[in-house]
Amino acid sequence: MAFLLFFVFVTAAVLCFVVPAFLLLCTSVQRRRDVGQGGGRDWQKKKKLRLPPGSMGWPYVGETLQLYSQDPNVFFASKQKRYGEIFKTNLLGCPCVMLASPEAARFVLVSQARLFKPTYPPSKERMIGPSALFFHQGEYHLRLRRLVQAALAPDSLRALVPDVDAAVAATLAAWSGGHVASTFHAMKKLSFDVGVVTIFGGRLGRRHREELRTNYSVVERGYNCFPNRFPGTLYHKAIQARKRLRAILSEIVAERRARGGGGDDLLGGLMRSRDDGTAGAVALLTDDQIADNVVGVLFAAQDTTASVLTWILKYLHDSPKLLEAVKAEQMAIYVANEGGKRPLTWTQTRSMTLTHQVILESLRMASIISFTFREAVADVEYKGFLIPKGWKVMPLFRNIHHNPDYFQDPQKFDPSRFKVAPRPSTFLPFGSGVHACPGNELAKLEMLVLVHRLVTAYRWEIVGASDEVEYSPFPVPRGGLNAKLWKQEAEEDMYMAMGTITAAGA
């Protein structure tokens, strides 16, 4: 009976909420579509092509119930085992082609990226802002991407290390004391603070910072809700908070203009950037375009990074010998900095070899971004199969990361595997191609600094079960990994006595 009630609940939820939401994204594509558009030899060639193997499930709903009634990763893995590395399905009313090989991922994201466009539900675009760079292709996207990449390049990040370090120190200090707290929630606060520093530098006042934090949290809570504008719903509250974010950001921009300059941070770059008009005219980005891209960067910088940080704490906690080795590496830097009296430097973060391997393995194991959505803009042939125009195409990053053909014993947490670089296109934690995450180096810097501060000054203990996974929407240990954190005395004397300290230059 309990199972029946659960099944009815899931079915009702999908039919009443999830399906309508996603149908806003999906165009109606007939199951048996006419692939003979055009004429001559092209028509004859397409006529011979076949759709990939797979099941389309029930009308409209497709295989959505199967997906949501189990771990999504198990669903995709079972499909790959049955049909191979390219298969079709229907999810939330949309026909999809799933691709689970490095070659296919490269085909969609890099070599033939022009044939596939990013696709998001309209409700998501409204929430973040339609001018955010990851909703676009072409010149506008490339120009903004270059701007963001410049703000997050090594030369720029070098100057951000003290700010990131200060944000990490403040987060851990607020968490410490032995009380139980959600690791994920603490890491979300940290990632938000790092995002704010990256966008605004050190120029943002406390009032604006707290207003941004308050309203952004409301937007975030409504982001994955059914887009119901009825007053009182989470979605309606999120839309109102998004309007307030626009007003706050316009006020910040106006204050900077009044001071006569934009500054050398990301916001300053956006304020100086110009938009190529359709008639060839060039104008500065509008306040709406600036606001959309600021919210977009905050969105991209928070939950994904916070999820990985949460997994890093779990993996280190569950691997005591590895934790001691990481601690030895970090204590060498800590002692070289006179017990933390001198600031951590960019050069030192580049010397954290084992810690960097731990981060890469955490990215692989957790595979926070399990897949990405694209849409075919034309009929596409791939390995003798037809990918029809309008179908969704999903490179399955997690399936690639957990394939024993590319990573031996893939379910084992083994950072040493990254002593050797992975084969091309087999490790895609930040995507690939022109839409790959431009903030990947910032995210890794945040992770390195957190591990340094954590293992040299704190100890932590996981409270309760931590093996189950929940999706919010990214995978994290259930409950966000409840844990206690304590400040501990520095251990540099012990490490020096053991002879494990080596010179670590600044």
Curated annotation (Swiss-Prot):
It is found in: Membrane. GO terms for molecular function: (+)-abscisic acid 8'-hydroxylase activity; heme binding; iron ion binding. InterPro entries: Cyt_P450, Cyt_P450_CS, Cyt_P450_E_grp-I, Cyt_P450_sf. Its main location: membrane. It catalyses: 2-cis-(+)-abscisate + reduced [NADPH--hemoprotein reductase] + O2 = (+)-8'-hydroxyabscisate + oxidized [NADPH--hemoprotein reductase] + H2O + H(+). One of its GO terms (biological process) is sterol metabolic process. The keyword Membrane applies. Heme binds at C437. Its cofactor is heme. Keywords: Heme, Iron, Membrane, Metal-binding, Monooxygenase, Oxidoreductase, Transmembrane, Transmembrane helix. Its EC number is 1.14.14.137. Belongs to the cytochrome P450 family. Involved in the oxidative degradation of abscisic acid. This is Abscisic acid 8'-hydroxylase 2. It comes from Oryza sativa subsp. indica. The lineage of its organism: Eukaryota, Viridiplantae, Streptophyta, Embryophyta, Tracheophyta.
